[in-house]
Structure formats: structure tokens, C-alpha cells
């Protein structure tokens, strides 16, 4: 197949440490048939996942604004950067992993008209110990992402 017919899959995950969600994403990105698919991974930080993906030949894009903790200025920066990347990369599929990447990724992916957006939950942030108002917002965002 030629480069033009490969399906571009843009993966998004919040953290680049090595854990369950990261291992899942690594397995998906590194086992795609490269003649048919072009995997690109967007992640926060330069941890072990980044190193493993790059060693396996998977292109990564690191965002310093993509962090687990909530910060309005970082969220705006993250959304802006993600919008720019999606518009530049023009993925056929956006595969988002984890709560934060899932909520923001689905929202921006829909705005940018990505043909297919897939969300994989690796735990529910609204079950964590956090203020009630955050749990409420997180539940609403999760509801919206699956619709």
C-alpha cells in the first residue's frame, strides 16, 4: 500500500509513565500493521512510554500542557495544542485513553470533525477522592463523551 492509503490513528493519553493504560496503548500502537496504519501518539511528559514507543519506531508528540492535575490555563493550552495537532495531522481515527484525555480529546476531536473517535476508559475519575463539584463535572463530561 502507498503512504496515501494508510489509515492514520492518533492516540492520546495523559501520562507517559509505564502503567496499565500506557501498556495497553503501547500494545495497540506497536502491533498495528504498518502497511495499513500510521500510528502517532500524543502524550504528556517524556516518561518510559515515550522512550518505548520511540524505540519501537512509533512517532510521538509530547505536550507539556497535558497533565493529570486540573489547571484552567493548562487546559486551555492543551485544548489549543490538541486542536492544532489534529488539524495538522488530519487523523482518520482519534483513540483517546483515560479520563482527562478522553473528555478533552472527544470534545476537540468532534469539533475538528475527526471521522472516528474511540474512547477507552481505564478507570473512572469521578470515583476518586475529590471535591463534589469536580465529580459532578467529570460525570457530565464522561456522559457526553460516550454519546
Where are these regions (language model features)?
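N-terminal strand-loop element at the rim of the active site
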Residues: 3-7, 11-74
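Short His-centered aromatic/hydrophobic patch
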Residues: 96-102
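Active-site proximal beta-strand in glycosyltransferases
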Residues: 9-10, 93, 109-124, 142
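Glycine-rich phosphate-binding loop signature in dinucleotide/nucleotide-binding domains
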Residues: 85-92
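Short active-site oxyanion
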Residues: 37-40, 92-94, 147
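Nucleotide-sugar donor phosphate/pyrophosphate-binding loop at the beta->alpha transition
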Residues: 73-80, 115-116, 125-147
Amino acid at each position: 500500500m502507498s503512504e496515501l492509503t494508510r489509515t492514520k490513528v492518533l492516540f492520546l493519553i495523559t501520562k507517559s509513565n509505564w502503567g496499565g493504560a500506557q501498556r495497553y496503548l503501547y500494545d495497540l500502537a506497536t502491533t498495528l500493521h504498518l502497511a495499513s496504519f500510521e500510528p502517532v501518539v500524543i502524550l504528556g511528559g517524556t516518561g518510559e512510554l515515550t522512550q518505548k514507543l520511540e524505540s519501537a519506531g512509533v512517532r510521538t508528540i509530547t505536550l507539556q500542557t497535558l497533565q493529570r492535575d486540573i489547571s484552567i490555563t493548562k487546559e486551555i493550552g492543551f485544548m489549543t495544542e490538541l486542536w492544532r495537532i489534529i488539524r495538522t495531522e488530519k487523523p482518520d481515527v482519534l483513540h483517546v485513553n483515560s479520563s482527562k484525555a478522553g473528555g478533552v480529546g472527544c470534545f476537540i476531536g468532534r469539533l475538528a470533525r475527526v471521522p472516528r473517535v474511540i474512547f477507552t476508559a481505564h478507570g473512572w475519575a469521578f470515583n476518586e477522592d475529590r471535591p463534589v463539584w469536580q465529580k459532578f463535572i467529570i460525570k457530565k463530561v464522561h456522559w457526553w463523551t460516550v454519546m
